[in-house]
From Swiss-Prot:
It comes from the Bacteria. The keyword ATP-binding does not apply. SUPFAM superfamilies: Metalloproteases ('zincins'), catalytic domain. Keywords: Cytoplasm, Endonuclease, Hydrolase, Metal-binding, Nuclease, Ribosome biogenesis, rRNA processing, Zinc. It comes from Prochlorococcus marinus (strain MIT 9313). Its cofactor is Zn(2+). NCBIfam families: rRNA maturation RNase YbeY. Belongs to the endoribonuclease YbeY family. This is Endoribonuclease YbeY. Single strand-specific metallo-endoribonuclease involved in late-stage 70S ribosome quality control and in maturation of the 3' terminus of the 16S rRNA. One of its GO terms (biological process) is rRNA processing. GO terms for cellular component: cytoplasm.
């Protein structure tokens, strides 16, 4: 096992963030959630903390290149049901909306110089579906968005949930991630 990366990472979300384009929705939410819908900085803070948490724990699934790289990049798109339905159909052959899609870009067989920025992939979240789920679970939209983005991130890092037990483990770790920067979410 190699030495784990302990220096801060430079997570590039500024150029890869695609905000929600729903003025009607952003007028109905609190200031923090509105900021999450329109700005990369809250996501950069959360994602950096979450990735650092995963990188520090050698028992957690995380590609070696992610543990060692000082610079990481990923895309985050907040979209609507129509767009995520199109993506779900194109990539998963499912003609239905979903809450979050992840498109991992990592190739674990690559050997890159340690100063290379590693592209993790893209996370796409349907804000409309997140809003319905937040209402269903009786919590704020901002919390549901954080839940979905943390789920997408774990998929980019190689996590999956083909069994009930693996899903339970993944959801439990998501709760730990959300507690790093604030409110815990119980799904």
């Amino acid at each position: 096992m190699s030495a784990l990366q302990t220096s801060p990472i430079n997570l590039d979300l500024d150029l890869a963030f695609h905000p929600a384009n729903d003025d009607a929705l952003t007028s109905l939410v609190d200031a923090d959630t509105k900021r999450r819908l329109t700005h990369a900085s809250p996501w950069q803070q959360d994602l950096t903390a979450w990735i650092e948490s995963v990188r520090r724990d050698p028992t957690l699934t995380c590609p070696e290149i992610v543990r060692l790289s000082p610079m990481l990049s990923l895309g985050l798109q907040l979209t609507d049901d129509a767009t995520i339905t199109e993506l779900n159909h194109s990539w998963r052959q499912r003609s239905e909306s979903t809450d979050v899609l992840s498109f991992p870009a990592l190739d674990n067989s690559l050997v890159l110089p340690t100063d290379t920025c590693v592209e993790l992939g893209d996370i796409v979240v349907s804000v409309q579906t997140a809003q319905r789920q937040a209402k269903q679970h009786s919590h704020e939209l901002g919390l549901e968005l954080r839940w979905l983005v943390s789920h997408g991130l774990l998929h980019l890092l190689g996590w999956d949930h083909p069994t009930d037990q693996s899903l339970k483990t993944m959801l439990s770790y998501q709760e730990q991630l959300l507690s790093i920067n604030g409110k815990v979410h119980h799904h």
